[in-house]
């Protein structure tokens, strides 16, 4: 006759309970690290901004099973898209261009917009020297314009998209000695908005495109040397997105934490370090519709590599 062992069956019962809990609440057991991704050509610089931010979020999401934060920095979009689809990256913080590209590649969801103090929407300006003969965008045919870098929203994709809509054709200059056809606009990457403004001032290029907020800040007392010939639509400066299949409970708590960050001294300090973001707030995704249409129409021009 087999004797009943309470200890043995008690162990099975405990195991059964753990399995049920694992099935019902996988986020609470598996996800101990909240992973945030960013894109930058200088990983160390971006890491110093993003790590305090994601650690702050993880600390306030302990009830959801997170005990620490981690940052993944890439120089291009596809690696982040791949990892988000695999569930290895939870969040992404970036500008509209990179956020929309990830949405298209990895089916990410937009959560909130990050705004700077005094402005919840930014726009690009296309400018020339005040003594330039260029008055309109069409006058840039046969000339050279400076953009920031291929992943910049306000320093590249937004102003270039506007010019594409106006029927202008582009050519990327690989050297300063290349010829520019009279029916196309040539462009070079300055790799920094400050460089873009400087290049225009010194006559290295005829025109430049930057975020208007940066234009006001960088040009400073020399604004009278420059002249704006066109401006773009307005977009949120920053967007935080989350991966597909992230728990709705986590998303809800995350949204609450983000929207309250600016109300505490600790949160304010973290935000100030994060590209001078003032606070996170709701936004209508319809705000992005014109840009998403632009992205779809000219996706071949904005090669996501």
Please place each PLM-identified region on the residue numbering:
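Bilobed "Venus flytrap"/periplasmic-binding protein-like clamshell domains
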Residues: 34-60, 97, 122-197, 269
């Amino acid at each position: 006759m087999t004797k009943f062992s309470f200890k043995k069956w008690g162990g099975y019962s405990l195991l059964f309970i753990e399995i049920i809990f694992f099935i019902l609440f996988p986020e609470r057991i598996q996800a101990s690290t909240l992973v945030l991704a960013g894109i930058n050509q200088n990983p160390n610089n971006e890491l110093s901004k993003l790590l305090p931010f994601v650690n702050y979020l993880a600390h306030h999401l302990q009830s959801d099973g997170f005990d620490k934060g981690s940052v993944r920095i890439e120089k291009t979009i596809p690696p982040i898209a791949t990892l988000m689809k695999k569930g290895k990256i939870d969040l992404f913080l970036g500008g509209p261009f990179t956020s929309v590209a990830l949405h298209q590649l990895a089916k990410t969801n937009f959560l909130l917009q990050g705004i700077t103090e005094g402005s919840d929407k930014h726009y690009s300006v296309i400018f020339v020297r005040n003594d330039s003969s260029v008055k309109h965008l069409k006058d840039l045919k046969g000339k050279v314009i400076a953009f920031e870098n291929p992943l910049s929203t306000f320093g590249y994709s937004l102003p270039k998209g506007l010019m594409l809509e106006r029927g202008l054709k582009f050519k990327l200059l690989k050297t300063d000695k290349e010829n520019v056809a009279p029916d196309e606009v040539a462009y070079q990457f300055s790799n920094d908005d400050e460089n873009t403004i400087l290049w225009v001032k010194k006559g290295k290029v005829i025109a430049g495109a930057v975020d208007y907020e940066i234009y006001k800040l960088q040009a400073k007392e020399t604004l009278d040397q420059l002249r704006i010939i066109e401006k773009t639509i307005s977009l949120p400066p920053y967007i935080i997105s989350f991966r597909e299949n992230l728990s709705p409970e986590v998303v809800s708590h995350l949204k609450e934490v983000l929207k309250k960050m600016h109300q505490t001294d600790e949160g304010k300090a973290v935000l100030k370090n994060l590209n001078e973001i003032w606070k996170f707030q709701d936004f209508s995704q319809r705000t992005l519709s014109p840009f998403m249409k632009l992205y779809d129409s000219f996706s071949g021009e904005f090669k996501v590599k």
